[in-house]
């Protein structure tokens, strides 16, 4: 836990995919919301992984052995990222243009959007581009590589003598040997957070996140530049592009030099950049390289990156920085000398033709126009004396890209990159067994179990299936479960590319028919988020989102969620972080026992569930007073009306220096655990190895012969970080998977927990748990969803705007255990209509949308929606018929109030039973309030140009007079203000700003402005 208090205003920005870096084509993801639109589930597919762009061949016999004897050269098809790609049948081989995984979908994990992914040369998770081969049906269109004569005309355009070559140097190569093969262990990542120096590290990636060549303040990185076949006098610039990243919270002045001679690397006229790089920021820039000044006329020179910041003794690590990549683009001659495969890039121009001469080429070499990578064209020209002359039609404003290959350059993929695709479900409640090659129907399932593909001792699939089978039984709640592997998810919903993004796309697909109150996602298996410890292709993980790990962000902001919010999980999600089947079964046995007790035991026998123990783990002598105050505030949320509750508190205050040694002092909780607790909370310090006031490993410490398992909430920094490595046992996972011991579920922080933030979260959590009855309390996963809505300010009853620490706390509070679990129940009495949630929100600045969920419905006929403007006198404004009773438990309802009044609107629901001999009975929900403020829609205020670099103009679409404006930076500080309609941003650093505009009628509008360099 960090005791530094930060009060920052955070403007919530809609993180979209509209502005992406030019190198990143996200259309397969933005055009296809789920990713499986291209699949014909009646076909067989074989996946072929390609790690380098180029021309490849596969024997038809190889494909036939996997797809069947019906495959011929006439009916073979292939797909890449949801698009059919053209093939060439060359004798007994299929020839195609193959592509590596460029990591473009990693951009979907960056904020404020994919444009923040500065190092576009690196994929975080994979190298393999997935190419799917299949047999076409008779009616299917077939794409083939066409041949085109490109013989030059005698009166054509002048011959072009060069293309633009780009040399790429990055610092993210996967290790190839040793114990860490296929990882990036030891390769610095900006920023891999350390508790000692980092005040905040978001789980989503940001501009500063990249693998780097790490430099201390007294170090330099020198590179030798040698531009092969450099052509001068073309009129085209040589361009250096680079990205520099801060790796600590300090300040540093970074410099970039380029010179013909190494001895000139300190000369001012050779310096491209001298700029302050503050904290965890990044500089992505380009410079024109001048032959004779920065390189020789032959294209040779030296490149240097350095910092001029004076080292500060032992704190030099605070000023660290690094270079993620650099590229040099330059005019290069059209020579194929000593090449087996070569790409030639010609810049975009208007319509017309390009006449080219490629030298040092032989008769067996082939030239493909790959400008459209999905549909290459085989070109033929005039070959004479080792020179190939071509005249190629140009597409207006599009680059021309050619791939030249020799016969040896057309390679056959290794056998290990082929595998037979199975769009399978490891389990479906519909059959009670596995189903191969099936399209999961969203309306059929609500309990989604995701596990990985590891085999042997590390496989946990059998345990995952057993868990799903239990949830399908009456005792388990009669859910409609499926079990699916990450491999199947990658293939169906992410074009075969491993990524955490795939899980969100799968869940988004599964909720397209509507989110049910019974929807849950259970991750079964370990997952690593620490970026330098991820295994290439993620073969044996159920991945988490980002680093620090966040399971919440896997399912947040899904487009099929009507209440979509990027910081709020669309459905409840939990994880069993197990390494073996037995560990999964250990937890299943605890869940079965916990729910058996609810069904079969008396309220008196379940009275232990009314016991709460609050542990306090202090670290310094000034903390007990404030920590006790925070815990008292949370305890005050426990009412007597839902009790009686038996609340105890234990602190390590007496063990603090100078009296004793607080480090890892065992917390005296054995008797509490053995007798039974409903909930155990730890408020205090911790790290990934445990809590300061040590609760220890449940598997080693407790007897718990009574099999009474508590819900556990831990605020200690990093105690929930089970995502850092593939080995070892973590406290958070041990308490879940320990046999007959530990917790029934746990909320725990995966990174930093700040005192104020943790205290506020704990207070709200206690309200969500203890102020609810057995009938109205949500599942542990549902509670987490509610907490996210309230804590981030995205529900009608929410707090004021959240700080970045508070939002990070939501992301980095993981739920370990089954999200469908209902806790603290002391009876199994059939429930009347009970509400899980009742909330309202302003919609389109004109309406108020009401939403409510019922946990159960019995003999319910309809709801009457009532509104009040004083909170006392209510009137009927609508009637909503019941959807129940539902086999799925409860239902979700919506109602639109199209005529709210400005100010506070109060609402309640009148639930009316079906008619009986004594007339219709009814009951009321709680009362909620929605503040309806008349505000303009963002579309009424326009800002142009945006992005911009100099001045931007404010206009009102309906002619309102601009009264005043303020411009805020990303931390809420005012950087400029005025009353005119022009905003000068020329002197501001590049980044994202919020413009707040007030018009003459006092309507306030906020617009996001992007400042470019």
Give the positions of each predicted feature:
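Terminal processing/anchoring signals of secreted or surface-associated proteins
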Residues: 21, 326, 367, 471, ...
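Cysteine-dependent hydrolase recognition
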Residues: 22-828
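Short, conserved beta-strand segments of beta-strand-rich sandwich/propeller modules, principally
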Residues: 300-302, 399-401, 849, 904-908, ...
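Short, compositionally biased serine/threonine- and acidic-rich segments at solvent-exposed termini, linkers
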Residues: 412-416, 824-938
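Short, flexible loop/turn segments at beta-strand junctions in immunoglobulin-like
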Residues: 392-394, 897-901, 985-987
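Bacterial Sec-dependent N-terminal signal peptides
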Residues: 1-25, 747, 798-800, 946
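Surface-exposed, proline-anchored Ser/Thr-rich loop/turn motifs
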Residues: 439, 832-857, 925-958, 967-973, ...
């Amino acid at each position: 836990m960090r005791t530094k208090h930060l009060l920052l205003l955070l403007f919530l920005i809609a993180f979209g995919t509209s502005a992406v870096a030019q190198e990143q084509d996200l259309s397969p993801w933005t055009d296809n919301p789920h990713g499986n639109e291209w699949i014909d589930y009646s076909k067989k597919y074989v996946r072929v992984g390609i790690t380098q762009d180029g021309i490849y061949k596969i024997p038809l016999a190889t494909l036939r052995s996997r797809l069947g004897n019906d495959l011929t050269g006439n009916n073979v098809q292939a797909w890449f990222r949801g698009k059919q790609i053209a093939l060439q049948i060359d004798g007994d081989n299929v020839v195609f243009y193959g592509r590596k995984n460029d990591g473009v979908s990693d951009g979907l994990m960056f904020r404020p959007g994919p444009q923040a992914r500065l190092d576009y040369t690196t994929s975080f998770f994979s190298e393999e581009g997935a190419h799917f081969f299949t047999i076409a049906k008779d009616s299917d269109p077939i794409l083939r590589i066409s041949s085109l004569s490109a013989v030059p005309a005698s009166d054509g355009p002048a011959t072009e003598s060069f293309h633009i070559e780009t040399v790429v140097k990055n610092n993210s190569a996967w290790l190839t040997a040793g114990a860490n093969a296929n990882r990036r262990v030891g390769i610095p990542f900006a920023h891999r957070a350390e508790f000692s120096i980092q005040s905040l590290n978001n789980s989503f990636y940001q501009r500063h996140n990249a693998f780097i060549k790490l430099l201390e303040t007294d170090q330099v990185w020198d590179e030798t530049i040698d531009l092969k076949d450099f052509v001068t006098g073309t009129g085209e610039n040589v361009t250096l592009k680079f990205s520099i990243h801060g790796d600590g919270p300090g300040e540093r002045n970074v410099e970039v030099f380029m010179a013909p001679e190494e001895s000139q690397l300190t000369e001012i006229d050779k310096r491209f950049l001298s700029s302050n790089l503050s904290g965890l920021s990044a500089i992505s820039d380009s410079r024109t390289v001048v032959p004779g000044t920065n390189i020789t006329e032959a294209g040779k020179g030296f490149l240097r990156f350095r910092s001029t910041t004076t080292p500060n003794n032992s704190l030099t690590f605070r000023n660290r920085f690094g270079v993620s990549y650099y590229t040099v683009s330059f005019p290069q001659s059209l020579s194929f000398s000593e090449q087996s495969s070569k790409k030639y890039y010609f810049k975009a121009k208007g319509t017309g033709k390009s006449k080219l001469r490629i030298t040092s080429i032989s008769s067996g070499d082939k030239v493909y126009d790959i400008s459209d990578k999905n549909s290459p064209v085989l070109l033929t020209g005039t070959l004479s004396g080792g020179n190939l002359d071509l005249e190629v039609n140009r597409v207006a404003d599009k680059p021309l890209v050619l791939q030249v290959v020799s016969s040896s350059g057309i390679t056959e993929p290794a056998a290990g990159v082929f595998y037979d695709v199975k769009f399978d479900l490891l389990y479906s409640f519909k059959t009670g067994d596995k189903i191969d090659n099936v399209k999961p129907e969203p309306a059929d399932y609500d309990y989604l179990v995701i596990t990985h593909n590891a085999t042997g001792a590390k496989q946990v699939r059998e345990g995952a299936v057993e868990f799903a089978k239990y949830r399908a039984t009456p005792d388990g709640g009669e859910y409609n479960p499926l079990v699916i592997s990450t491999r199947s998810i990658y293939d169906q919903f992410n074009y075969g590319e491993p990524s955490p993004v795939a899980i969100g796309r799968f869940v988004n697909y599964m909720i397209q028919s509507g989110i049910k109150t019974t929807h849950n996602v259970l991750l079964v298996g370990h997952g690593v988020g620490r970026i330098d410890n991820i295994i290439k292709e993620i073969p044996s993980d159920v991945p988490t989102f980002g680093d620090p790990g966040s399971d919440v962000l896997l399912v947040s902001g899904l487009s099929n969620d009507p209440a979509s919010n990027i910081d709020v999980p669309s459905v409840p999600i939990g994880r069993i972080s197990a390494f073996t089947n037995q560990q999964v079964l250990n937890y299943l046995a605890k869940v079965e026992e916990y729910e058996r007790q609810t069904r079969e035991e008396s309220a008196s026998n379940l009275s232990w569930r009314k016991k709460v123990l609050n542990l306090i783990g202090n670290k310094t002598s000034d903390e007990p007073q404030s920590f006790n105050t925070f815990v008292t505030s949370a305890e005050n949320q426990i009412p007597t009306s839902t009790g009686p509750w038996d609340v105890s508190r234990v602190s390590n205050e007496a063990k603090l220096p100078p009296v004793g040694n607080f480090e890892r002092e065992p917390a005296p909780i054995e008797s509490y655990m053995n007798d039974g607790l409903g909930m155990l909370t730890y408020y205090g310090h911790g790290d990934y190895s445990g809590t300061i006031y040590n609760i220890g490993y449940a598997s080693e410490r407790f007897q718990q012969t009574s099999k009474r398992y508590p819900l556990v909430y831990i605020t200690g920094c990093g105690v929930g970080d089970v995502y850092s490595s593939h080995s070892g046992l973590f406290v958070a996972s041990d308490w879940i998977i320990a046999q007959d011991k530990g917790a029934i579920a746990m909320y725990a922080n995966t990174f930093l927990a700040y005192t104020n933030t943790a205290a506020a979260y704990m207070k709200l959590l206690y309200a969500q748990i203890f102020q609810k009855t057995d009938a109205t309390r949500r599942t542990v996963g549902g509670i987490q969803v509610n907490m996210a809505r309230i804590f981030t300010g995205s529900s009608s009853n929410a707090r004021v705007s959240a700080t970045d620490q508070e939002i990070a706390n939501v992301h980095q509070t993981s739920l370990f255990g089954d999200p469908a679990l209902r806790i603290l129940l002391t009876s199994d009495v059939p429930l009347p209509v009970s509400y899980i949630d009742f909330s309202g929100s302003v919609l389109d600045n004109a309406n108020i949308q009401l939403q409510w969920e019922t946990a159960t419905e019995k003999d319910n006929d309809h709801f009457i929606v009532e509104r009040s403007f004083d909170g006392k006198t209510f009137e009927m404004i609508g009637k909503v018929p019941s959807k129940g009773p539902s086999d799925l438990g409860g239902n979700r309802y919506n109602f639109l109030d199209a005529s709210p009044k400005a100010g506070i609107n109060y609402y309640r629901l009148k639930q009316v039973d079906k008619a009986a001999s004594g007339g219709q009975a009814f009951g009321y929900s709680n009362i909620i309030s929605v503040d309806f403020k008349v505000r303009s829609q963002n579309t009424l205020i326009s800002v142009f140009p945006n992005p911009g670099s100099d001045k931007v103009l404010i206009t009102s679409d309906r002619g309102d007079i601009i009264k005043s404006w303020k411009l805020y930076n990303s931390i809420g500080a005012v950087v400029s203000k005025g009353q005119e309609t022009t905003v000068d941003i020329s002197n501001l650093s590049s980044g994202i700003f919020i413009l707040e505009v007030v018009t003459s009628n006092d309507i306030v509008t906020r617009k996001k402005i992007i400042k470019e360099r």
